[in-house]
Amino acid sequence: MTDVNPQTATVNAEIRIGNHTIRFSAQFSNEAIQLHELLPFFQNITDKVVEIAIAEVIESGKRISCHSGCGACCSQLVPISKAEGAALLNLIETLPEARRSEVRSRFAKNMAALEEADPGLFDKLEKAALDHDKERIKAIGLAYFDLDLPCPFLQDQSCSIHPQRPLSCREFLVVSDPAYCAKPDPAVVENVVLPKRVSSILYNLSSRDSNSDTGFMPLIQLLASAESIQIGQPTPAPAIDWVNRFLERLGG
């Protein structure tokens, strides 16, 4: 249910996710905003969905293998929505100068290594995504992992931006032996299947044209594509409109 006044709208939502229900009440502005300004809300909902998935894993008699200090999955081809891209660019600018320089250097180093090893990877990934070719996307991801390019935000095998980490990172959990994650063979790595993927919804909302814009990009491309990320953001809309569009997809 949505209560509206000229300045804000209150959303009272109850959404069935898997075998559980998410309930919340929150106020949102009726003023037009950029999608990335709602990222804390999307992160919160993602965390709730992940909590539900973990509860269902435990109920099934299994346990999550992931733990603090394990950075095995942090060399993957991490997808981020264009909205997240804008937020991460802003985040980098707030880092202390020495840390900001280090992160920028790591991005540049990884991009140079990728350009040397597989200069057409981004084009292949975009084509596979627009074709909805999940097997091809998976193969491209595994090929990228083999290049051993740790995330520029990784520090001492832990995420240095953990509270602001991408939705896809929040959603990635395994129940198989963590040793298998050193080389993620789909035959032995057992991922947790989430009842809903908030990241996919945000990709959709970030897209300006579903026929030519996937709405997401590889995290490693963040700084190299900074200008296109900024100008490629979806048209601003009232916060309540973004939220309603999101909830329609989450509950659908």
Say what each PLM segment does.
Residues 1-252:
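Short loop/turn segments that flank or connect secondary-structure elements
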